[in-house]
From Swiss-Prot:
GO terms for biological process: catabolic process; L-leucine biosynthetic process. Pfam families: DmpG_comm, HMGL-like. This is 4-hydroxy-2-oxovalerate aldolase. Keywords: Aromatic hydrocarbons catabolism, Lyase, Manganese, Metal-binding. Signal peptide: none annotated. The active site is at 23 (proton acceptor). Mn(2+) binds at residues 20, 202, 204. The keyword Lyase applies.
């Protein structure tokens, strides 16, 4: 395994407030919200700003929830104010197409993160190759990384690298990885990837480990860290950007951003937009404990309210069934099963 010094190495700061953060408000950012947040992030000198519906390009749908605007409207708004950061987006094969990718490129996107379930990297080939042909930076994004072993994950990252990905991410979509889990996965990735291929960490805060896991990732050779202002993201949110930067600053790491501007943006712009606090609570903790896809939270809360159930019960059952991103339609099925069980139990009494 190659070792890395962290003191002088520049950490690439990838903000996800305008993509993952969209989950926290059911994809209802206004164009003006996107513009204000992007301008604040750009002035704070983050390296990239990811913009899209929470479920990536063309995620706006019955299954995932309709966005207040189209992806291109958000992207154009961000492109109108950004001067330093690269504009990034997320694409899930099967939801977004190469046509959508080309349209995003024309709108100003220069980095695409092609996201698959952690054992399904083979479906990313077409989109990664298309991105490279367009001259975009292509990043492999292995979601729900807690659901497979470090060795299998490394093999999947190697596939993405072979398609042209120049960076591969460990994505803790369920916020379920421990610090040792993170260590093991980055060691495995670094053992098989080319020296020039970057690695990245995308954490969720469901077990309050978002910042800790990001720090461990960097200590294990990770080059890029995803984070969001005020932790704005699915479930209990992502690693809070301003908190990670404060910790990195105290550790003497080279992050290149303005901590105070990030703190102001988090509290003055982003936090007031939350219609449900982004925090660790009973429901979001259940996500991390059960290893459930973080964006299932709001859908599960809706189903629980509709059928008179506890959100936690739905989430834990989803974890038992090992549901993954893209299976949002199963949330209602699980709720109805739990309702039937409750009624049959009451009838038996």
């Amino acid at each position: 395994m190659r070792t890395h010094m962290t003191a002088n190495r520049k950490i690439y700061i990838s903000d996800v407030t305008l993509r993952d953060g969209s989950h926290a408000i059911r994809h209802q950012y206004s164009v003006n919200d996107a513009r204000r947040i992007a301008q604040a992030l750009d002035e704070a000198r983050v390296d990239s700003i990811e913009v899209a519906h929470g479920d990536g390009l063309q995620g706006s749908s019955f299954n995932y929830g309709f966005g207040a605007h189209t992806d291109l409207e958000w992207i154009h708004a961000v492109a109108s104010v950004v001067k330093h950061a690269k504009i990034a987006t997320l694409l899930l094969p099967g939801i977004g197409t190469v046509h959508d990718l080309k349209a995003a490129y024309d709108a100003g996107v220069r980095v695409v993160r092609v996201a698959t379930h952690c054992t399904e990297a083979d479906i990313s080939r077409q989109h990664i190759e298309c991105a490279r042909e367009l001259g975009m930076e292509a990043v492999g994004f292995l979601m729900m990384s807690h659901m497979t072993t470090a060795e299998v994950l490394a093999g999947q990252a190697k596939l993405m690298e072979s398609y042209g990905a120049t960076c591969c991410y460990v994505v803790d979509s369920g916020g379920a990885l421990s610090m040792q889990d993170v260590r093991d996965r980055f060691r495995a990735l670094k053992d098989v990837l080319k020296p020039e291929t970057h690695t990245g960490m995308h954490a969720h805060h469901n077990l309050s480990l978002g910042v800790a896991n990001s720090i461990v990732a960097v200590e294990s050779g990770c080059d890029r860290v995803d984070a969001s202002l005020a932790g704005m993201g699915a479930g209990a949110g992502n690693a809070p950007l301003e908190v990670f930067i404060a910790a990195a600053e105290r550790m003497g790491w080279n992050h290149g951003t303005d901590l105070y501007k990030l703190m102001d943006a988090a509290d003055d712009i982003v936090r007031p937009l939350q219609d449900r606090p982004v925090r660790v609570d009973r429901e979001t903790l259940a996500l991390g404990y059960a290893g459930v896809y973080s964006s299932f939270l709001r859908h599960s809360e809706t189903a629980a309210a509709k059928y008179g159930l506890k959100t936690v019960d739905i989430l834990v059952e989803l974890g038992k069934r090992r549901m993954v991103g893209g299976q949002e339609d199963m949330i209602v099925d699980v709720a109805l099963d739990l309702l039937r069980q409750r009624r049959s139990g009451a009838a038996a009494v």
